[in-house]
């Protein structure tokens, strides 16, 4: 009876599906274990062998936990909103819903083929209206909340309104917009409804504001920083510029400190935690106000939100972590986008300033942060006044200052900051750049800045002279507060998250507008479903794609979507045209899995209380400052509102490494007329071009030239001259990220079809530690497949089952329990690769021992089951068991079988080992010596001589000294 993986795989995958073997219950007396993978975006390319790596690891843990008696929730779904589907719709005219469903069907087929124990009865899709109605509901809760710093939590907006009615806003301790005008309770009562709404927008956790965004004209939408690479969109490579737009934003900054402190309570890798700490960017210092010398007057409009803020144009507000260095301020730098730039720039400098702003708009914030070598800037012609010395300080703009961090302005102290030092020296001698001031006692700044706070005394600083860092900081803040030109402050780099996207394929906002102000649609009328549109591009007048819909207005009488032509702004109003970003649906999805068929709420309190939070989360580290941060933010908000039981959504996080592809390249000349073989390019200028692996010999790396010429991807080179090595064209090879665009993708279906799903599962784990990246090497697969065939032969010969009920040998029991111990420890420590090695050792040992005993082979099938579930189920069934192997308790290691009763002693003569002998460990040295001296091999070695000394160390060595 031969091992036939294709038959076995299909049989048990069908069995699991029909019996819903892995469906979890929300009411079990078993302890719960919730294990989750970051759900995939269903792209048209399908899965390659790199994608299942994390899923296989999580599946091993899920199956193991079931064996250990846990009620395991291991769900799967699809993050199905997103830009790629929309771009494909634009190109082909197909509705994104259609292509998304097709892609999901393909993903499901591939996932099923690998044999994952997902609870598919809980599948979710973020693009389904019955899912995103709850995303819309959460948005409404955020809109109707404010952050009370006194209670350190989000509260309902009605409590804020009540405080306004009683005492105005002067004593409100809230996270809100800066520089809100003070008002009394009487003022509040006298404000118009629209003005009250505008004020509340400055406190709400989701709000409308004019924001600097990454605008991609080619895609017609705003992009997040992590969607931009080297100044162009990750999707399509389109240029990205910075521009101001009125956008929905999320006040994630309210949770900055809690997000920071929460990292201490979760079991995540230190690298991910550090990424989030840096992104949150806590710094303690002071806010300082510098009076601007030649500002222009500012006219405010009653019709805009800005009428609620007092004029801040008399001062440049600066946050600094080094108020002790305030007497070292040599110049000031504003972000090019700073609102003061246009107000203070002199006519003489206007042209240079505008040219610089235009240039800067083409760079993303991430690029500007990363580029520490390039120095650029322009003098505005304006001056600020030093709060203590009253000296004039020139005001520059520079792209190393970001509008969204701090106040978008810095006080430049070149003697104490390397970047300020480089900037001052670069523009040394130019108009608006004074000499660098040195305020450190006995410190030489002739060649570099002195950035240390330690072991330095302040000098040339009036009342701060002779003080150290801590003393001078405290004194400077006190004096600034006396002048009413500063105060101590804790600042965070974390900025509020832009939540609007100008695209079609995303969650619609449950928002309509009355007199330009946002109104929430009542939750009982959700979902607000995406409308049909004729095209998915922005409208001709620049509105988002939803502007193409003829039916996108809200009727407040019928409480349903109405035709635009019926808008009367008395009962029927325009709906929001933007959609939510790609991260909206993934910011709470783990909670929906707890109760996915609940139509009334995103999950029942009972289900949430039972499952609580995710015990193990597996996914890529690239989400460190995106999804993982937003998910923590939403979870904390839902905790504040009483909907989540814990502060943190994911107790433990593992980031799987990548499986790398082995790419192939041909090398073209500059004129594209010649293609050089790899060994001939060292002295030539060439460009490497990725080659489809299907047209090369994987063993010899030889290119099939005729196939290359006929390949549709390379038709441009059909007439090119191939420069060969020894009559062959040898391609170059390089290990890099596996990607369809690099033509180095290996399809898991191909592996499953040829070797079976269990071979793929074992091989991916065998490649190396889960968290490391490793190259794919097809050559190793046959070894794993051979192991499974060898395992099969322990149970079957050509005639059928050969398992006996005989008593197993001590050696076989030792091999089994050694493996039970090792595999248990490995799974608990997530060291899956070493388990596969142990399985191979065990099967080799059992084969040598000619072991066919049920007492060994039945538990062996169970411990193999998490890794290779199909063959394990088949073996278990063939052994006469009717229930699924997944329901059986995991074997326990009995240490008594691991105790060594014998020892293989090396026997040496004058220190040279000549043979080995197996002896019981309980023998005394005298008994060992007696046995050794009678052994024929000893007699032969001594050749009639008597040893001078016999050295015996029990359990270790025997040495005869002649």
Swiss-Prot record:
One of its GO terms (cellular component) is cytosol. Signal peptide: none annotated. A motif ('KMSKS' region) lies at residues 737-741. GO terms for molecular function: aminoacyl-tRNA deacylase activity; ATP binding; leucine-tRNA ligase activity. Keywords: Aminoacyl-tRNA synthetase, ATP-binding, Cytoplasm, Ligase, Nucleotide-binding, Protein biosynthesis. ATP binds at residue 740. GO terms for biological process: leucyl-tRNA aminoacylation. The keyword Nucleotide-binding applies. It catalyses: tRNA(Leu) + L-leucine + ATP = L-leucyl-tRNA(Leu) + AMP + diphosphate. Its EC number is 6.1.1.4. Its main location: cytoplasm. InterPro entries: aa-tRNA-synth_I_CS, aa-tRNA-synth_Ia, Leu-tRNA-ligase, Leu_tRNA-synth_edit, M/V/L/I-tRNA-synth_anticd-bd, Methionyl/Leucyl_tRNA_Synth, Rossmann-like_a/b/a_fold, tRNAsynth_Ia_anticodon-bd. It is found in: Cytoplasm. A motif ('HIGH' region) lies at residues 40-51. It comes from the Bacteria. Belongs to the class-I aminoacyl-tRNA synthetase family. This is Leucine--tRNA ligase. It comes from Flavobacterium psychrophilum (strain ATCC 49511 / DSM 21280 / CIP 103535 / JIP02/86).
